């Protein structure tokens, strides 16, 4: 029996198993000891934390059944070592977890991209014949009080840290096909946002928007910077885009140089996430200018997208009226829609030393086990409140 972190035997499920053994009157068969359970047929239940015992686990033999409890916390590194270790004929790994984050390795590995011979089963309160009245009452209250928390606790759905998220998950849900719900159409500029992959396992991403409607998202890993720039340019031409906006710092510098060499069939602009705030003297809210509210253009751009999602949520749910160009709609036809929704809701709000809003760094997100939000960043660029400039000015 494994879990990612087990500081003591009391953190394990040994007591739960002992209670079941007693309830089923199996004490004569199982010897429940302090740190293990031994059966008369030679079976043995052992308990360990993966993170602190991963080296010794690699050398374990004779294990034919593994139960990983609280699997949502298990890291990619732990899975990559544990799975090849369980190699007895007919062996199996059973994982039980309540998913926190659609981007977590456990959820991606076994639910989104399950391997062959993997069976994934969603088990909720409806499947529990002993679900108590007290929990039913708590569930109904939570559904009214905090719908996002209810979805996670009682429906087993991965959700964001709603209180800290820049863009709340519930706002994003209401934005799906909002143009159909509210009766507006895709009109205005066609833009392609291009987030360039950093080193390692990072991905490239394109966002395709037409006015206030997000029509498609593409993500890929293969190819170098030049290949990715060419792919983006070809996709933009096919989309009949008016503008490509790309991440122009770091690896993106190579993209800038390559775009300058391409035929000027459409406008191209760079986006410097750490750059100065646009329209610094303009008031964001009464009494507070943009330069007093945001630490950089990245924060300002995420907030601009946040405002679109919030207004769309208010318009769809409560009937509030806003101009179409202040709203946003995510087409339900986007293949990567669920992943995009997760990425949009993961970055947390942060603040600089002067109290201005900034976006949680990718380094801090990585500490939480959250990969770089490439698709979300590509979309943010499409709605960034930047002043138009030519590629030659970058």
From Swiss-Prot:
Disulfide bonds: none
Name of this protein: Uncharacterized protein HI_1410
